């Protein structure tokens, strides 16, 4: 389901850093590697792209899909790289999940060369994503407060002022934050719900979901998202803040 949510944001994120042939780029919290794979062609044979994630299962998928990238398992708050190791660092939809986002940003700053470029994307407030907003309300009613809280955390860094502040506090300069909108597409509201509950954030946490609770959740979300149903499936807007900065 990665294409449904993330792929359309990749060119926007990479445009912010304007990769050049021969450069070294680090993709922090790379997941299955969609950003890193796209970057390979931009840095060319003389460049080098590294994708880092703390989740070994995600990296296994990434390795199978992107042999031209160096995949590393590691912690964004303690990057296993030397100071000034990269020309560019990017992070797509990972910053909000780090236990200490400030520490992760300081680490990104450390591994960049002087004048290095950094770009990050984080979702705006959950109200800007009707699909996830409806899902979170349903989770609260049918699964529980813990599940709803985990879903809300995906949108937990949705304030542009806060994003700018933590970047500047980490030592970044020339910080620019802008808001963008894209459309997330799924075959149906049911598959969207199942993907999030069983295969995305909640699926990696151990939160137990009973069959009858999931069925009730699917019915509620399907009803709430009828205004966003199209002939080819579900399509709802999502908004993100994209920030660019330099060391």
For each predicted feature, which ranges?
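Conserved alpha-helix/loop element of class I SAM-dependent methyltransferases that forms part
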Residues: 4-23, 38
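Conserved class I S-adenosyl-L-methionine
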Residues: 117-145
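A short SAM/SAH-binding and catalytic strip from SAM-dependent methyltransferases
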Residues: 87-101, 124
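Conserved Class I S-adenosyl-L-methionine
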Residues: 6, 32-34, 151-247
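A short glycine-rich, Lys/Arg-flanked "PGG" loop and its adjoining helix->strand segment in the class I
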Residues: 102-117
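Class I SAM-dependent methyltransferase SAM/SAH-binding core
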Residues: 24-79, 88, 103
């Amino acid at each position: 389901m990665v294409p449904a949510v993330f792929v359309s944001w990749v060119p926007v994120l990479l445009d912010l850093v304007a990769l050049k042939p021969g450069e070294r780029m680090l993709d922090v919290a790379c997941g299955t590697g969609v950003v890193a794979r796209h970057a390979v062609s931009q840095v060319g044979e003389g460049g080098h792209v590294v994708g880092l994630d703390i989740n070994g299962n995600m990296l296994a998928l990434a390795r199978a899909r992107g042999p031209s990238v160096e995949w590393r398992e590691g912690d964004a708050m303690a990057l296993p790289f030397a100071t000034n190791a990269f020309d560019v660092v990017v992070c797509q939809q990972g910053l909000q999940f780090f236990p200490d986002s400030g520490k992760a940003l300081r680490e990104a700053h450390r591994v960049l060369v002087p004048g290095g470029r950094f770009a990050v994307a984080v979702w705006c407030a959950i109200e800007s994503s009707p699909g996830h907003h409806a899902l979170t309300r349903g989770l609260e009613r049918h699964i529980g407060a813990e599940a709803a809280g985990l879903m809300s955390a995906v949108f937990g860094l949705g304030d542009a002022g806060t994003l700018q502040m933590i970047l500047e506090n980490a030592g970044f300069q020339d910080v620019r934050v802008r808001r963008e909108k894209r459309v997330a597409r799924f075959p149906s509201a049911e598959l969207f719900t199942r993907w999030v509950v069983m295969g995305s954030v909640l699926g990696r946490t151990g939160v137990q979901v009973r069959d009858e609770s999931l069925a009730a959740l699917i019915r509620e979300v399907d009803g709430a998202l009828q205004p966003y149903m199209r002939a080819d499936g579900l399509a709802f807007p999502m908004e993100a803040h994209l920030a660019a900065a330099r060391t």
